[in-house]
Amino acid sequence: MKKMPGDASLPHGPVTFLVGKEEQRIEHVSKNLLCVRCEYYGKMFGIGMKERDAAEITVPKTDLASFTAFIDYLCTDQLDLGEGEGEQARRALVLRELAQMHQVPRLELLCAQALQESVTPATAVPLLEAAHTMGDGRLLAQCRRYVADHAVEVRASGGVEQLRDLGVAKGLLGDALDQVAELKMGAARTAAGRRAAP
């Protein structure tokens, strides 16, 4: 976005966000800064829009911690994914959705990178399902490969019990059957090589 602070077309004053079903508050966020950092808000608070003069904006379909991290990113250019592997992966997923919805491509890329780095035995299956739902082929392939290569650890972490999506379950079963077929073919080649050896 080419606008800069001081541009007369930018709105003045703060906005309060009412977040989630409980309408928890994030107060005193500069509309001007939001418009400069995010094209979505530039349009929302643009000339002729009813939100331009609104003191409060409701954001019902997210949680306070994730939306606070999103607003903090817009205001400071710093990404906070929280503490702990599971929380970081969950927050990265939610922030990525917020970045897509609000058209913030750099944040979307940072979240995609964080997701790729957060694949562990405990997160592989939930991330696999999320990648399937979002249509993220790269993360999907990475998670499938991880589950195949670390099956024992994923199973021990409870990853299999977390599986909810039948399509993903079918894909994992297909991967397992492919691995069994490869093992059998390898064993057959080894046996044939032994028989052919003098």
Predicted regions and their residues:
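Terminal low-complexity, poorly structured segments
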Residues: 6, 29, 75, 111, ...
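BTB/POZ-protein C-terminal extensions
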Residues: 24, 56, 80-84, 88-97, ...
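Canonical BTB/POZ domain core
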Residues: 9-120
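Peripheral membrane interaction modules
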Residues: 1-7
